[in-house]
Regions:
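Nucleotide/pyrophosphate-binding catalytic subdomain
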Residues: 1-218
Length: 218
């Protein structure tokens, strides 16, 4: 015979019960992905809500703790917009799209590497020293070329905006093998048609960078 007792739970008991339920629900997912590498794009509302920021960091730590190898690629649109406004950086729009001028690129670089990436690394590392923040500029991680943007059949110069053309995937894999979680800002050095650095840095969309890294892992 089974007895169902309706006993009020305090916050601690409820939390423990809910955690156990989540673990049971996640077991099939854990078995499926254990030992595999997963690329996760961090962006949207999760970047501006402190509660969602922490929940994301918790999820990444949980993935690592059950044997999944996460790679995080992050954007920073809301923070970049806020910093551009705060610093009164001149911004030009063409066909409704923001042009990444050298001045805008300086803000993008500062926000992605110095603010968003650092905050996420700190949240993850509050549990254990797992996360390592980096950008596409570090050790030739990513290489990019300027994007060709076509609107209504016309090519538009969007400034320092690029697409990934090469990924140093061996660097990423070596970090994963050491038990690290790469947290990657997608600002990337530009290369010419021969693969030589031009000395310029390009702003790369985080979704595009995450896709390029995932494809390089295949």
């Amino acid at each position: 015979m089974t007895l169902a007792l309706d006993i009020p739970l305090n916050d601690t008991q409820f939390s423990a019960q809910r955690k156990s339920e989540v673990l049971v629900e996640a077991l099939p997912w854990i078995r499926r992905f254990q030992g595999r590498t997963v690329v996760v794009k961090y962006g949207g509302n999760a970047m501006v809500d402190p509660g969602l920021q922490q929940a994301f960091a918790d999820d990444i730590v949980f993935m690592a703790s059950v044997g999944i190898r996460p790679i995080v690629v992050h954007g920073g649109g809301p923070q970049i917009n806020a910093m551009l406004a705060e610093s009164a950086t001149p911004v030009e729009f063409r066909n409704g799209l923001r042009v990444t001028s050298p001045e805008v690129m300086e803000v993008v670089r500062m926000v992605l590497v110095g603010q968003v990436g650092r905050q996420l690394v700190n949240r993850i590392n509050a549990y254990a020293p797992l996360a390592a923040g980096m950008s596409g500029e570090d050790s030739g991680l990513l290489s990019a070329r300027k994007s060709r943007v076509i609107v209504d059949g016309e090519q538009i110069d969007m400034g320092l905006v690029g697409d990934i053309v090469d990924v140093n995937i061996d660097l990423v894999i070596s970090m994963l093998d050491r038990g690290q979680i790469p947290v990657i800002a997608p600002v990337s050095p530009e290369v010419d048609a021969a693969g030589r650095p031009t000395g310029q840095v390009l702003n790369v969309n985080a979704d595009t960078a995450a896709t390029a890294i995932a494809q390089a892992l295949r």
